[in-house]
Amino acid sequence: VVIDASTRILTTLQQRRSEFGSNPASLRNYIDSELNRTFDRDYAARLVLGPHARGASDADIKLFADAMADSLMQRYGSTLLNIQGKPSFRLKGESPLPGNRGVRVSTELVRAGSEPTPVEYWMRNVNGQWKIFDVNIEGISYVQTFRNQFDTPLRQKGIKQVASELHSGSMQAGPAGNGK
């Protein structure tokens, strides 16, 4: 599932590079449709929110999940287009997650002239379909990174305000540790 989805996405990005480069909305729509097929946004959002998710409504969780995904697409969508050559993914193996929460699928992103990059996908079965809820690139967890990044803003402002700021672009999901 992971290798097929990753290969499909990389191939489509390469084939439609000029279209996506001149039409960012088309790129966002494509990535959004792929995320909906393969990614468990709401569960990932609950993990990112951590204790802030307790007592939150499903609507607030969805609001945050969508805002975070939109922010990530705006920030990283064009980066995906700039991958040169013909990258591919190589499956290394899979293992069960603790507590029977799903599986960890270990892969490597292989690019000509570069060392392979380890990428792990944490997946769970949702109504008979395997969905990704966390991605670890070179040992760095997307969920843990964003949980750390958003903890203080969530404590200070709450889910709705942080989601609103993510959606407006005044706050971005990304590697910075201060929420901006």
Task: List each model region and its residues.
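Solvent-exposed loop/turn segments at secondary-structure junctions
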Residues: 53, 70-71, 96-97, 110-111, ...
